[in-house]
C-alpha cells in the first residue's frame, strides 16, 4: 500500500443530516404544537436549537462543508413548494409570507380531514386557514422509506418567492460562526416530483416560470455571502427522455448566465448517472456529487469525460444504510482520484443525505458488542469521512488507530458465526423450482377451497389489524418496562382478542382475523422472533413529518427458531366456528422495511426470510388453518429506479413469495394484501405470485386500479378495498355498493371479495364499527343483485 498522502487537506462534506434530533426532539415539539399545548414560538425555538446542535456536531466531527436549509419542520419538498409559492387555492393563501398554519394544512389537512391523514397523530392547531381541507398527497422519496408531500400544479400555475427559509437559515448559521453551503431541491427534480390534476399539463412546461424564482433566492444567498450552493437533482439517476435532459440544460444555463460567480454543487444520488452522464457533465456547474456506493464504477467515465476543473464530491460512505465502512479499502479506491485531480478538486461525502440513517450509535447501549462494532450512524459516518480525509492529507499516523479498528471490524464481520449459519446457506442452496409451485393450478385449488370453506358469494373480511387503543399501547409499554408480568399481559391480550372476535361475529363478517393486538409492528414482531435480526432503542429515522420508524437490522443469516404466530392463531380459532385467517408479513416486505446486510445480494437475504416464513405457513396449516394471509405491502417499494432493472427484482421477489406460500395443500387458501396506489405496470408479477386471494387498495382511486383488468384477464380472486381506512369518515352503504358495482364491471362475481383498503389499527372502534356494519350490508345487497 502506498503512503496515501496529498499536500492539501481534503474537504469533508455532508449533503444533509437527520432533523429529528438524537431523542426525537422534533417529534415531541411538533406533536405538542399540533395538540395546542405549545406555541409557535416554542416550536421555532426547538427547531433553532436542533439546527444549531446539528451544525456544532458536524463541525466537531471534522466536516468542513456543512449544509444549511437541510432542516425541515415536515418535509424538504413541501418547503420547496412553499418557497416558490406553489400553494393550491384550497389552502387559502393570498400571497405574502406563508404561515405555519398554511404549511401544516398542506402537510396534514385541517380539522375533519386531519385525523385521517396517513398514520399521523390527529391533532390540530387552530388558525384562519380553511377548515376541512385535505393534506397534499404523500408518496415515497425515490426508493427510500422517507415520504414527501407531492407538489400540485395547475395549468395557470405561477410562482413567486414566498419563503426566505434558505436565506434565513444560512444567516442563522453564519451568526453562529458556520459558513455553510445552502441546500435546495433542484428545479427539474422538483417539477418531476409534482403532479397536475389536469393530465394534459406537462409539468416541465412550467420550468421557464419556475427558474426565475430559483435565480432570485440564489442571488440573495450569494449577496449574503454564500460562495457555493448545493442543488439536489436526483432525477438525473432516473430514466430520462431527451426533452427532460434539455430541461436540465435550459434551467442550469439560465442560472449560470444570471449568476456567473455563484458556484453550484449539483448533487445526484440513489444511483448512477448512466445515460444521463453527458447531460450532467455539459451543465455549467462548478461541482458534481456522485453516488459511488450504488454506482462505484461511474467515477471512471466522469474522470475521462468531465472538465478537469470540475470539483468532484465522492459519495463513498453509505448514506442509506447503517454499516461501518471499510476505510483501508476506501483509501485504496480514493487515493488515485485525489492524486490525479488534486485535493482542492475533491470532496469526501456520504452517498446521499444522512436523513436516512439514525443520529448516533453511541446512544445504543444494549446492542451485542460485535454487532455494534460493525455499525455506523450519522455522526459516526462523519467521523469515518474525517478519518479518510486525515489519512489522505498526510496525517496517517494520527488516524492509524481508527483505520486499524475499521479493518478489524470488517474482518470480524466477514468471519463471524453470528452472521454466517451453514445450515441456513445449505438449505437455501437446496431450494428447487418445485418448491415455488403449488400442487395444482388455481382453478383446481379454488374448487377444493370452495367445497371446504362454504362461503357465500362476495365474502366479507378485514385485512388483519383492529384498533390499537390507548389502553393497548399503555399495556404494551408497561409490559416492556416490566411493570406488568408476562402472564398478566397475555391475559389482557387474550381478552382483547376474544372481544374482537365476538364483535366480528356480531357484525356478520364471513372470515375473521384475531386483531393483531400482540403485535407492535408488522415487521418488528417477526424480526424479534427470527435469528439474524437485531433491534435498536434509539435508531429512529424520519418517515414523514413527526412519524419516525426504527427499522430492524438484518445482520446475518435468517432462520426461525420456533413458531411465531401459531399459538395466537389456535387461541383465536378456538373461539369461533368461522374461518380465522393466519396473519403473516411476507419476506419482501420484511426485507424492504429493514436495514439490510450489504455482504450478500438482497435476493439472498430475501430467500432466507422466505424459507423461515414457509416454515410458519406449514405450522399454521398443520394446526388447522384453512386460510393464511401473507402481506406484501412493500413489494412495489422495492422496484429499482431504472425500468430496465425491474424484471430482475420482480423475478426474485415473486419467487420468494411463492417459496413461502407454496408448501401447502391445494385446499388451503393463500391470501396476500398490497397497499399502494398503482400496480397496472406490474400486473404480470402480481398474477405470477399465484395467491388464491389478493386484497388491494382501490377505494381512493374509485376502482381505477381495476382498469388493468379490462385488458388483463386476472385469473384468481380479488378483494378491491371498498372504503378508505385512512379517513375517519364512515362511508355509506350506497358508496360501497357503487364501488362494488364498478368492480363487477371488470371482474366476475365469483372472483370478488369485500374488504376495507388496509388494516384498521390506526382507527377508532366507533369509526370501524360504523364502516364494517355498512360494508357487510353492502355485500348483502350486492349478493341479492347478483342472484337476480
UniProtKB/Swiss-Prot annotation:
Catalyzes the transfer of a methyl group from 5-methyltetrahydrofolate to homocysteine resulting in methionine formation. Pathway: Amino-acid biosynthesis; L-methionine biosynthesis via de novo pathway; L-methionine from L-homocysteine (MetE route): step 1/1. The active site is at residue 726. PANTHER family: 5-METHYLTETRAHYDROPTEROYLTRIGLUTAMATE--HOMOCYSTEINE METHYLTRANSFERASE (PTHR30519). L-methionine binds at residues 463-465, 516, 631. The lineage of its organism: Bacteria, Pseudomonadati, Pseudomonadota, Alphaproteobacteria, Hyphomicrobiales. It catalyses: 5-methyltetrahydropteroyltri-L-glutamate + L-homocysteine = tetrahydropteroyltri-L-glutamate + L-methionine. This is 5-methyltetrahydropteroyltriglutamate--homocysteine methyltransferase. The gene is metE. 5-methyltetrahydropteroyltri-L-glutamate binds at residues 24-27, 140, 547-548, 593, 637. Gene3D superfamilies: 3.20.20.210. It comes from Rhodopseudomonas palustris (strain TIE-1). GO terms for molecular function: 5-methyltetrahydropteroyltriglutamate-homocysteine S-methyltransferase activity; zinc ion binding. Binds 1 zinc ion per subunit. Its cofactor is Zn(2+). Its EC number is 2.1.1.14. L-homocysteine binds at residues 463-465, 516, 631.
Amino acid at each position: 500500500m502506498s503512503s496515501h498522502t496529498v499536500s492539501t487537506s481534503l474537504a469533508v462534506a455532508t449533503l444533509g443530516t437527520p432533523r429529528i434530533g438524537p431523542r426525537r426532539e422534533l417529534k415531541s415539539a411538533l406533536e405538542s404544537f399540533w395538540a395546542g399545548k405549545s406555541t409557535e414560538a416554542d416550536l421555532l425555538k426547538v427547531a433553532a436549537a436542533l439546527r444549531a446542535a446539528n451544525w456544532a456536531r458536524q463541525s466537531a466531527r471534522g466536516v468542513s462543508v456543512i449544509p444549511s436549509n437541510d432542516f425541515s419542520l415536515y418535509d424538504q419538498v413541501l418547503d420547496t413548494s412553499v418557497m416558490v409559492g406553489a400553494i393550491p387555492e384550497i389552502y387559502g393563501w393570498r400571497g405574502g409570507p406563508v404561515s405555519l398554519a398554511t404549511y401544516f394544512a398542506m402537510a396534514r389537512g385541517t380539522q375533519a380531514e386531519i385525523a385521517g391523514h396517513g398514520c399521523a397523530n390527529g391533532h390540530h392547531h387552530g388558525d384562519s386557514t380553511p377548515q376541512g381541507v385535505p393534506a397534499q398527497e404523500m408518496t415515497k422519496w425515490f426508493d427510500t422509506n422517507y415520504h414527501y408531500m407531492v407538489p400540485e400544479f395547475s395549468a395557470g400555475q405561477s410562482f413567486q418567492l414566498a419563503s426566505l427559509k434558505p436565506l434565513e437559515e444560512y444567516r442563522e448559521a453564519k451568526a453562529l460562526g458556520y459558513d455553510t453551503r445552502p441546500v435546495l431541491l433542484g428545479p427539474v427534480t422538483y417539477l418531476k416530483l409534482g403532479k397536475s390534476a389536469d393530465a394534459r399539463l406537462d409539468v416541465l412546461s412550467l420550468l421557464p416560470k419556475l427558474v426565475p424564482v430559483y435565480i432570485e433566492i440564489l442571488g440573495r444567498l450569494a449577496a449574503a455571502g454564500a460562495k457555493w450552493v448545493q442543488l439536489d437533482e436526483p432525477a438525473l439517476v432516473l430514466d430520462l427522455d431527451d426533452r427532460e435532459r434539455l430541461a436540465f440544460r435550459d434551467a442550469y444555463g439560465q442560472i449560470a448566465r444570471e449568476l456567473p460567480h455563484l458556484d453550484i454543487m449539483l448533487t445526484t444520488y440513489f444511483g448512477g448517472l448512466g445515460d444521463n452522464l453527458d447531460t450532467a457533465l455539459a451543465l455549467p456547474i462548478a461541482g458534481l456529487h456522485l453516488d459511488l456506493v450504488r454506482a462505484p464504477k461511474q467515477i471512471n467515465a466522469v474522470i475521462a469525460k468531465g472538465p478537469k476543473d470540475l470539483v468532484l464530491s465522492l459519495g463513498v460512505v453509505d448514506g442509506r444504510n447503517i454499516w461501518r465502512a471499510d476505510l483501508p479499502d476506501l483509501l485504496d479506491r480514493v487515493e488515485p482520484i485525489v492524486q490525479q485531480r488534486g485535493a482542492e478538486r475533491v470532496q469526501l461525502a456520504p452517498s446521499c443525505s444522512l436523513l436516512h440513517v439514525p443520529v448516533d450509535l453511541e446512544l445504543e447501549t444494549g446492542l451485542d458488542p460485535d454487532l455494534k462494532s460493525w455499525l455506523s450512524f450519522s455522526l459516526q459516518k462523519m467521523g469515518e469521512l474525517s478519518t479518510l480525509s486525515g489519512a489522505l492529507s498526510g496525517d496517517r499516523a494520527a488516524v492509524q488507530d481508527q483505520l486499524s479498528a475499521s479493518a478489524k471490524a470488517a474482518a470480524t464481520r466477514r468471519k463471524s458465526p453470528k452472521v454466517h449459519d451453514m445450515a441456513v446457506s445449505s438449505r437455501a442452496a437446496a431450494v428447487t423450482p418445485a418448491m415455488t409451485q403449488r400442487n395444482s393450478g388455481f382453478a383446481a385449488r379454488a374448487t377444493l377451497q370452495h367445497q371446504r370453506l362454504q362461503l357465500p358469494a362476495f365474502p366479507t373480511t378485514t385485512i388483519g389489524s383492529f384498533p390499537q387503543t390507548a389502553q393497548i399501547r399503555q399495556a404494551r409499554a408497561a409490559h416492556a418496562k416490566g411493570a406488568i408480568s408476562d402472564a398478566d399481559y397475555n391475559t389482557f391480550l387474550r381478552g382483547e382478542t376474544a372481544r374482537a372476535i365476538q364483535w366480528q361475529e356480531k357484525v356478520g363478517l364471513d372470515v375473521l382475523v384475531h386483531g393483531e393486538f400482540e403485535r407492535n409492528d408488522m415487521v418488528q414482531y417477526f424480526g424479534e422472533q427470527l435469528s439474524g435480526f437485531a433491534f435498536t432503542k434509539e435508531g429512529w429515522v424520519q418517515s414523514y413529518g413527526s412519524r419516525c420508524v426504527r427499522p430492524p437490522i438484518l445482520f446475518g443469516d435468517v432462520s426461525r427458531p420456533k413458531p411465531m404466530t401459531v399459538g395466537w392463531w389456535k387461541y383465536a380459532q378456538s373461539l369461533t366456528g368461522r374461518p380465522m385467517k393466519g396473519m403473516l408479513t411476507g419476506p419482501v416486505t420484511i426485507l424492504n422495511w429493514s436495514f439490510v446486510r450489504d455482504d450478500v445480494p438482497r435476493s439472498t437475504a430475501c430467500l432466507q426470510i422466505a424459507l423461515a416464513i414457509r416454515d410458519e405457513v406449514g405450522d399454521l396449516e398443520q394446526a388447522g388453518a384453512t386460510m393464511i394471509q401473507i402481506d406484501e405491502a412493500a413489494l412495489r417499494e422495492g422496484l429499482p429506479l431504472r425500468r430496465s432493472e425491474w424484471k430482475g427484482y420482480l423475478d426474485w421477489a415473486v419467487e420468494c413469495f411463492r417459496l413461502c406460500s407454496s408448501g401447502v395443500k391445494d385446499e388451503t387458501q393463500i391470501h396476500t394484501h398490497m397497499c399502494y396506489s398503482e400496480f397496472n405496470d406490474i400486473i404480470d408479477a402480481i398474477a405470477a405470485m399465484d395467491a388464491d386471494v389478493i386484497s388491494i387498495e382501490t377505494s381512493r382511486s374509485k376502482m381505477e386500479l381495476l382498469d388493468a383488468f379490462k385488458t388483463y384477464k386476472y385469473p384468481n380472486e380479488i378483494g378491491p378495498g371498498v372504503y378508505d381506512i385512512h379517513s375517519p369518515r364512515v362511508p355509506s352503504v350506497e358508496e360501497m355498493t357503487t364501488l362494488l358495482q364498478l368492480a363487477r364491471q371488470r371482474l366476475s362475481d365469483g372472483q370478488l371479495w369485500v374488504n376495507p383498503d388496509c388494516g384498521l389499527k390506526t382507527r377508532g372502534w366507533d369509526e370501524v364499527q360504523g364502516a364494517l356494519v355498512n360494508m357487510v350490508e353492502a355485500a348483502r345487497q350486492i349478493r341479492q343483485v347478483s342472484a337476480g
